Structure formats: C-alpha cells, structure tokens
C-alpha cells in the first residue's frame, strides 16, 4: 500500500482487521545522531511533521485501539495521528514498556559517529545490527524480541481477532521484532531491515486463517 493512496480507498478497504505499524516521528536525538534507547526524548520539529503527515494518510481509518510504548516520542506520534483522524472518536490507548525501543545501555546519549571513532566502526556495527550481541549494559535485538513478541501475541492479536483496526506506534527495533515475527524473517535477515520514522506499514488480518499479510 503506497503512502499516497487515496483516503477514500483506505477507508473502504480497511473497515476492520487491519494492523498499522508506525515508528515514531524523528526525535530530537535522532536529529543529533545519538543513541536513544529508553531515554525519554521528545519529537523534533521534523518528527511532528512526519506524524502529522501519517495522520493525514490514516485519517479515514476507523481504529478500535492504539498500542504504544512507555516513551513520549511514540506516544506523541500516536496522539498526533489520532488528533487528525476523522472517524474513530475516543478510543483506548494502551501504553506498555514491552513496546519500548531496545535499551542501549552505556551507549545511550552518545553520538553514534563519535562512538564509532572511540570503539571502532565494526564494533559499533555489531552492537547496533547483530541479532544477539548487546551493547554494554543494554539489550540485543534478540532480548528486545523476547519482550515485544509476547506482547504482540497476548495483547495485539486478540484485538485483531475481535475485528478491530489497530494502530501500533513504537520504535525501530521493537517494530523490527514484530515484523520479523509476522513475516517469518530470519535473525540473519532482520538485522538489515530499515524502518523509517513516521511511515505507516499496513498489514491485513485474515479473520479465518489468522494470518497477517503486508499490503
């Protein structure tokens, strides 16, 4: 599903059983090229604009529930999106730390380029992109997936089974874990998946088979 799809088309197609995943809009530390992790930084001006554009794209989808993390950048992205929604009305917003970004441990707050100069680009690449090697004091993608995927199965899938359209506003690595699970992507392949800020991803839920299909 392209981002420039007409609103009427989205409204007609996604009446029920759709999952929308979105990484929060650009944060202040994204703009400064810093490791963020669980540090609770706000959206940048660009990030607010990204959330507004996503809200316009999704404005005719009747959502039944929003799931988001415990961090303000994801929560605010969801708030902005829903403030531009024309059809959903007041809906529950579920906030849970299991959808948080990977914890980057000792790297949180550090500039990525400066960290690469200090520790070597190869080591920093391993910390950032390997599946099971955590940064010092932090989480690997594998550890992130071990909390994110159970949340997805226990809290999000039941909403889809109930016929709800579901918005999940979260983070690059928590969403990477969910996409890996949905699309059966291997650990070797998932580390190269890039998820852009503020860009909705559409999945259609089949009520009979329980399968999710990328649109």
Regions inferred by a protein language model and the residue ranges of each:
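A short, acidic, amphipathic alpha-helical segment used as a generic capping/interface helix at domain edges
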Residues: 149-156, 160
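Loop-to-helix element that buttresses phosphate recognition and phosphoryl-transfer chemistry
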Residues: 20, 26-80, 84, 134-150, ...
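Residue-level preference for the first positions of well-ordered beta-strands
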Residues: 19, 163-169
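GST superfamily/GST-like fold recognition
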Residues: 172-176, 212
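Short, well-ordered strand-loop elements centered on a beta-strand within folded domains, enriched
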Residues: 208-215
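Histidine-centered divalent metal-coordination motifs
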Residues: 24, 171
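Extended, charge-rich low-complexity interaction segments
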Residues: 122-138
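Phosphate-coordination/substrate-recognition cap region in phosphate-metabolizing enzymes
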Residues: 4-7, 13-14, 52-125, 154, ...
